[in-house]
């Protein structure tokens, strides 16, 4: 069958002897003639490459990247169960195989296959490069023609790219051998632009959506359809999406053909995407230069998730964003989708249109795409107030979403807040750095996207918005279709703006500088014609000019620029009205590590039920301490640094129907919580729950604890060339009090643990707990251990083993500190005691369904359904004061676990189970329900 497809693929070739309409003459040209074979999950065929030597020196070989071989082997550093999440039936390889290389006359050429050095990843390094030996040296700017016969395989996977999932094939870059500079051997990831054209043959039941200026359906012969794909300008690839279930809607903008391809039930999003896309293209084109494509398609990707990906002439959108568009509220993710489309469309200018080294200098791609998209979003939806979910209408669900997520601001909480967390965790380092040299791989995404955007925003503040936009337009004119490096962009911007940017680039791109400006105080004195105010300022970190804005008593403002050349200084403001407050960097243009001290006086905002309906939303700004008051309690916090809350409600444990209200609500329940993140290795938390608290009599049940959490990181191998930091060991020190007031017993607990989840799927924890004598209980101490291990029997088939053991070290434990087997489902009253042994084994079967997407009342969707069976049991004994039968109890059961969609990509696991007692007194078969996070 494969041979017959290859024959039919040639039927239309006579009509397309020349597929180039306006391709540049100084770039290489690719003429691809390929066929999709769904049986083998491969694209097979040939490429005729008219190669131009643009290296500036004579060469005797051509280097081709075989990108498909990056996925030829599984990652040996990850436990196989982690890999299962990416694949349909366990690991499935991608690869590109070379069948032969010939010259322009059809004569065989010598070639070799080379491995890669571990510059991007540390596994699957074999066969990365095809090296074609030239019969004689090729002079600079000269051409040579070679034809490569190849076959590339799609993985059966949910890896977003280079895969086939549910009959839809997706591959953006490098499905064909790509000629690359020889320097790539030493690192970097470059995709030179070339004049690409192709004929693609597929079974007639498949539809093709390719990123090409023109896609023409030629004819169908013997059940096979051939498409012609051409481009008017050099591109970096012809991205492909091929599937049986895809449909499309079309539109146009300024003569550019727009398409949106969607899977079943995705039409509403497709039409919305076309509407957004027209607005986005108009904005980007007007401000950042001409779009270099004649056709653009948006495609719903088959893999779930809230993500977007771009390639030449194509934007892919994760299926979850499409399918959850109106769930659980109408238009729930419309703003998020608009931003994502703006980001991916920006790549048609930066990253794809203007190329870069996607390894060391990916800032030019992702940082610039963030700058274009967030600038667009803020000009349309505002930049300082909540703006991601404020478009939702009234309603019960909508109001709940507003309470939980209504504060979100795109820039503040999706860019600045992650950057601040990066600083707190100590994962910052230069933006421009190859993967293999990264000291903190954990921070790579935040540095490239979030910090990268903030650096461009600061650059705009430094040179001016008009100058930066002029530089971006000029870069689009001069570098589209080429590879732009950071130094060339710096030189271009300096020329346009007339500003020396060496220090700025050294601080923020080649270095890991930070910045913080603070208003220490101000003094106002009366002058002859008004008032004179001296503002005292302080700066740490990089030198950046700062706007200082003062608000006057009459509501007007005055501003002045502080150049911040010294670490401390002052400026003088003249005004006709007294100054009441001062704000440094009021438009939040600079990557400030602490915006709270940008105000004088400091901002403390109070949200309460009696605020005017016309008052602006307070949200959760990064420059203010926010306190919220509700009928049941009070809460507050600052950024992600710390949060606290206090909630008090009447205790309903008594007779709620009593005639005397005092009898019904004679006590209260109080919950207090506090959490603070200090740095990568240290955090603190405190919780206190007082149940049936009678303040007058000093009675009630109390469970309170204050914990110091410490983490020790290691650098396990992850398959990436960079250094990854994982919290392998932890130590928690807890001071608490537990029991009935006034005799509640204070205690201290030391817990240590180790996680080897990445390579072994193994976790262990030990804890020692000791009561503090003299407060109503005797002295005692306990020790306990718990562990978990997952064994992979086959793809998606697991054997989970968990165990617990606890015993006293000395003394007699009180009831509040005794053990009981609370995981048992078939025993209503398992015994208490100061000794316990407990174990559980689970057999987790492959999912009955996966990524089902079954809606439930338009509130959520069932994604996965997993069946499992378990046996668990143990014994608790010694010093019992409550339920005291100390025999062994064992039960068996089965569960169906439904994984449902949460909010913003989070999931919940709801398990419905049935347990049967096997051994022990008082057992009774029972149905149970559990809610947890998916493992």
Describe the function of each predicted region.
Residues 85-100, 114, 123-124, 128-135, ...:
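Extended, low-hydrophobicity, Ser/Thr/Pro/Gly-biased non-transmembrane segments
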Residues 63-113, 201, 551-553:
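Solvent-exposed beta-hairpin/edge-strand motifs
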Residues 20-44, 502-503, 507:
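N-terminal, polar/Ser/Thr-rich
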Residues 229, 260-536:
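Hydrophobic alpha-helical and helix-loop surface patches within well-folded domains
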Residues 730-737, 743-873, 877-880, 884-885, ...:
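C-terminal outer-membrane beta-barrel translocator/porin domains of Gram-negative envelope proteins
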Residues 617-623, 641-643, 676-685, 697, ...:
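Short loop/turn motifs that connect adjacent beta-strands in outer-membrane beta-barrel proteins
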Residues 209-210, 501-502, 515-518, 522-586:
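Beta-strand-rich binding/interaction modules
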Residues 546, 556-563, 571-578, 585-680, ...:
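Outer-membrane beta-barrel initiation region
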